[in-house]
Amino acid sequence: MKKISTFIITKNEEARIARAINSVKNITDEVIVVDNESTDDTVHIAKTLGAKVIVKPWLGYVGQKSFAESMCVNDWVLNIDADEELSQELQDEIEYIFASHNQDRYLAYQIKLLIMYRGDQKSRMFAPLNKCIRLYNKKFASFANTINSTTHDSVVFNKDVDFIGKIYLLNGIAYHYSGTSIEQLVNKANFYSSEQAKDLVKQGKKFSNFRLATEMIWWFLKAFFIRRYFVFGFDGFVDSIIFAFARFLRLAKLRELSLKSRNVIASDNYINYCMDIKSLLQKKKRSRYPKK
């Protein structure tokens, strides 16, 4: 009746993985956890809760999720992150859709993600809410369809699929819990910005000194006011700064990689130039002093 596989990617998530698995294990046939060589108790906890755990070295966000998706036996798959939890209302809604065999009326379902701040036991009024496809039929859509990025992990439909009117927004919500600590958020910002910078280089993006100078200001204002981090008070102020700093780091690292690439090219060109001069001088010497 269920015919759903859930997949989760993890890295040192011992503090949160149980909550995520417990929120999906009653509505899915299997829970696949693809772990990036955690050094804590993540793998043991996941196995104890009945998940199938596969240890896989890091392939990037898109690569890791694509691999996890491919490990699922069912066509219908549900993806959640280790820091997320389905509400009981959302669990009941998904269970009802599949129990009544109505899931194939649509190709994918969007889920509303409500941001919960560290330590919050209930949601705050006006808290940020994001919508994204997390439940879908992998015959028609996949994380693997994401191109030119290892970081922007999103479900993309196959090119030949007409998905207009085939995506349904579920009424229930899922909770997205923010970082476990400031240290964890800063570490994540550092790692994620490095991955993003590499993506930008692959895409041939150029850095701008003006954007570099204004990036933090713009993204702080966007996070604090437009994304409504102000709802979380001074803690939201701190998180907005970290978020903006991560965006700044992305461009700063792009600049660094671009300059390194230029220096390497310049160095190679100089070496080639010297070799050409040396070859030319040798030719002139041979022409001046021909063999007897």
Swiss-Prot record:
Keyword terms: Glycosyltransferase, Transferase
Keyword Transferase annotated: yes
GO terms, molecular function: glycosyltransferase activity
Gene3D superfamilies xref list: Spore Coat Polysaccharide Biosynthesis Protein SpsA, Chain A (3.90.550.10)
EC number: 2.4.-.-
Tree of life domain: Bacteria
Record-annotated disulphide pairs: none
UniProt keyword Glycosyltransferase present: yes
TM regions (residue ranges): none
Pfam families: Glycos_transf_2 (PF00535)
EC category name: transferase
Family assignment from sequence similarity: Belongs to the glycosyltransferase 2 family. WaaE/KdtX subfamily.
Protein name, UniProt field: Uncharacterized glycosyltransferase RT0209
Organism: Rickettsia typhi (strain ATCC VR-144 / Wilmington)
